[in-house]
Amino acid sequence: MTEMGHRALIAYERPDSLYNCHYSHWGACNLRLKRDITPERPFGGDRDNEAARCLFDALAEATTDETVNRVLKETAAPQSQVDQHPLVIGTTIETIITEHLDYLHHEAFYVVDAEFEITAYRTHWFGLQYDSRTIEHAPTVGNGALRTVRWYDGEPVGDGFAQGEFRALKAVVGEMVDQGVFSPAEAVEYMCKKLDAWAGTRDEILVRTPVER
């Protein structure tokens, strides 16, 4: 049985402007990877490691799974916060957030650009099956919103409040669906509008729903 964690996906920009997507089992906790990923520690960790950097550079150039497997076999990098074996290589952000990111089980998503500037997003799942008696199932992949978090002095500001705010919103919306005020589609539309209003001009909101695909 897989140990519960604080799961995250990380998209690393490649020299060809595409992305490699990696998984971290604990990377969403306190959005720690925004601090822990650096050019010297591309997969996180407590200390700089040249082998990890060489592995990262080689993976950034890989174009086939065979190359990935060979590079991983040949490079003895230490264990790290981010799984070194990529889930997918040479893809786009759009593909990751619509086809790979699980908005229920992945608590965070990071985009690491070529200069190692990192954008951290919290995930908000639109599924209401745990908040409504009349909804039995909702997809978890490609069905939610990504929301940036404000930072001050290296720490996320208002992260816990924002998560609680969205949980409370879902509880209210789920009840409104049960009362016939909203259809499931109208419920998602309402949640999107509330997120946009809360974000204002400070935060970035990215929304993906199955209807869009």
Segments (PLM) and residue ranges:
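Acidic, polar-rich N-terminal leader regions of halophilic archaeal proteins
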Residues: 1-213
